[in-house]
C-alpha cells in the first residue's frame, strides 16, 4: 500500500488496551476526530516508554483539540497490558491515558510503511489523520530518537487553523502567530 498526503489513510483495526481493558478499535471509530497514529518499536525498551508517557500526559491537550493519540507496536495486547501495569520505576508505564494498539500480524505497521521487515518492529512513525480520514502529515524517525509532543501539538494547531481560516502557516508557526493570506501575502511579508 502506498501512502500519500492528501489521500485516505490506510484503515486499521485490532485489539488495543484502552483504560486497562482489551477493546477492538478501528480508524472508523474516530471519524470526526483528528487522529495521531504513532508507531514505536517495542514494549519494555528505553525510548519507547518516554514517548508513550509524554503523549499520555498530554492526552487532555489533544482531547481539547478534538484529537486522539493511538500508539502501536508489533507487540501483543498482553505485552501492552503488562507494560502498562508495570510501575514506571521498573521500566513500565504505570498506567496511561491513551490506547495502545497491538499489531502482532505486522499489518498496520506494513500498511503505514514503517515495518522493519527483518527485525519485525516498526520505526517511530507518527501519522496525522484528519476528521475525514485523510492523511495530512507523516514523520518517521529512526529507532534511537524519540518524538516531540510539543511539535505534534504545533502541527495539529496549524492544520486546524488552515482548515478553519484558509490561510497558511509559515515555518515555526505557533498558535496565535501571524499566518499568510495567500490572496494578500504582502501583508505578512511586509512585517517579517
From Swiss-Prot:
<comment type="similarity">
    <text>Belongs to the peroxiredoxin family. AhpC/Prx1 subfamily.</text>
</comment>
<dbReference type="GO" id="GO:0000122">
    <property type="term" value="P:negative regulation of transcription by RNA polymerase II"/>
</dbReference>
<dbReference type="GO" id="GO:0008379">
    <property type="term" value="F:thioredoxin peroxidase activity"/>
</dbReference>
<dbReference type="InterPro" id="IPR050217">
    <property type="entry name" value="Peroxiredoxin"/>
</dbReference>
<dbReference type="GO" id="GO:0004601">
    <property type="term" value="F:peroxidase activity"/>
</dbReference>
<keyword id="KW-0575">Peroxidase</keyword>
<dbReference type="GO" id="GO:0005078">
    <property type="term" value="F:MAP-kinase scaffold activity"/>
</dbReference>
<dbReference type="InterPro" id="IPR013766">
    <property type="entry name" value="Thioredoxin_domain"/>
</dbReference>
<dbReference type="GO" id="GO:0140824">
    <property type="term" value="F:thioredoxin-dependent peroxiredoxin activity"/>
</dbReference>
<keyword id="KW-0597">Phosphoprotein</keyword>
<dbReference type="GO" id="GO:0042744">
    <property type="term" value="P:hydrogen peroxide catabolic process"/>
</dbReference>
<dbReference type="InterPro" id="IPR019479">
    <property type="entry name" value="Peroxiredoxin_C"/>
</dbReference>
<dbReference type="GO" id="GO:0015035">
    <property type="term" value="F:protein-disulfide reductase activity"/>
</dbReference>
<keyword id="KW-0560">Oxidoreductase</keyword>
<dbReference type="GO" id="GO:0005829">
    <property type="term" value="C:cytosol"/>
</dbReference>
<dbReference type="GO" id="GO:0051082">
    <property type="term" value="F:unfolded protein binding"/>
</dbReference>
<keyword id="KW-0963">Cytoplasm</keyword>
<dbReference type="GO" id="GO:0051920">
    <property type="term" value="F:peroxiredoxin activity"/>
</dbReference>
<protein>
    <recommendedName>
        <fullName>Peroxiredoxin tpx1</fullName>
        <ecNumber>1.11.1.24</ecNumber>
    </recommendedName>
</protein>
<keyword id="KW-0049">Antioxidant</keyword>
<dbReference type="GO" id="GO:1900745">
    <property type="term" value="P:positive regulation of p38MAPK cascade"/>
</dbReference>
<dbReference type="GO" id="GO:0045944">
    <property type="term" value="P:positive regulation of transcription by RNA polymerase II"/>
</dbReference>
<comment type="function">
    <text>Thiol-specific peroxidase that catalyzes the reduction of hydrogen peroxide and organic hydroperoxides to water and alcohols, respectively. Plays a role in cell protection against oxidative stress by detoxifying peroxides and as sensor of hydrogen peroxide-mediated signaling events. Relays hydrogen peroxide as a signal to the transcription factor pap1 by inducing the formation of intramolecular disulfide bonds in pap1, which causes its nuclear accumulation and activation.</text>
</comment>
<dbReference type="InterPro" id="IPR036249">
    <property type="entry name" value="Thioredoxin-like_sf"/>
</dbReference>
<keyword id="KW-0539">Nucleus</keyword>
<comment type="subunit">
    <text>Homodimer; disulfide-linked, upon oxidation. Interacts with srx1 in response to oxidative stress. Interacts with pap1 via transient disulfide linkages.</text>
</comment>
<dbReference type="InterPro" id="IPR000866">
    <property type="entry name" value="AhpC/TSA"/>
</dbReference>
<dbReference type="Pfam" id="PF00578">
    <property type="entry name" value="AhpC-TSA"/>
</dbReference>
<dbReference type="GO" id="GO:0005737">
    <property type="term" value="C:cytoplasm"/>
</dbReference>
<feature type="domain" description="Thioredoxin">
    <location>
        <begin position="3"/>
        <end position="161"/>
    </location>
</feature>
<dbReference type="GO" id="GO:0045454">
    <property type="term" value="P:cell redox homeostasis"/>
</dbReference>
<keyword id="KW-0676">Redox-active center</keyword>
<feature type="modified residue" description="Phosphoserine">
    <location>
        <position position="148"/>
    </location>
</feature>
<feature type="active site" description="Cysteine sulfenic acid (-SOH) intermediate">
    <location>
        <position position="48"/>
    </location>
</feature>
<dbReference type="InterPro" id="IPR024706">
    <property type="entry name" value="Peroxiredoxin_AhpC-typ"/>
</dbReference>
<dbReference type="GO" id="GO:0005634">
    <property type="term" value="C:nucleus"/>
</dbReference>
<feature type="modified residue" description="Phosphoserine">
    <location>
        <position position="105"/>
    </location>
</feature>
<dbReference type="GO" id="GO:0061692">
    <property type="term" value="P:cellular detoxification of hydrogen peroxide"/>
</dbReference>
<dbReference type="GO" id="GO:0006979">
    <property type="term" value="P:response to oxidative stress"/>
</dbReference>
<keyword id="KW-1015">Disulfide bond</keyword>
<dbReference type="Pfam" id="PF10417">
    <property type="entry name" value="1-cysPrx_C"/>
</dbReference>
Amino acid at each position: 500500500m502506498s501512502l500519500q498526503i492528501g489521500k485516505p489513510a490506510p484503515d486499521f483495526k485490532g485489539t488495543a488496551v484502552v483504560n486497562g481493558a482489551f477493546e477492538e478499535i478501528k480508524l472508523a471509530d474516530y471519524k470526526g476526530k483528528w487522529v495521531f497514529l504513532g508507531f514505536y518499536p517495542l514494549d519494555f525498551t528505553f525510548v519507547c516508554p518516554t514517548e508513550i508517557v509524554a503523549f499520555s500526559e498530554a492526552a487532555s491537550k489533544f482531547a481539547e483539540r478534538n484529537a486522539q493519540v493511538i500508539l502501536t507496536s508489533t507487540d501483543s495486547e498482553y505485552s501492552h497490558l503488562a507494560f502498562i501495569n508495570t510501575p514506571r520505576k521498573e521500566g513500565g508505564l504505570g498506567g496511561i491515558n491513551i490506547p495502545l494498539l497491538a499489531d502482532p500480524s505486522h499489518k498496520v505497521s506494513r500498511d503505514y510503511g514503517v515495518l522493519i521487515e527483518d527485525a519485525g518492529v516498526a520505526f517511530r512513525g507518527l501519522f496525522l489523520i484528519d476528521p475525514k480520514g485523510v492523511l495530512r502529515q507523516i514523520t518517521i524517525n529512526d529507532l534511537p530518537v524519540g518524538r516531540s509532543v510539543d511539535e505534534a501539538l504545533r502541527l495539529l494547531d496549524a492544520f486546524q487553523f488552515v482548515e478553519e481560516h484558509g490561510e497558511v502557516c509559515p515555518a515555526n508557526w505557533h498558535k496565535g502567530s501571524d499566518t499568510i493570506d495567500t490572496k494578500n501575502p504582502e501583508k505578512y511579508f511586509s512585517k517579517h
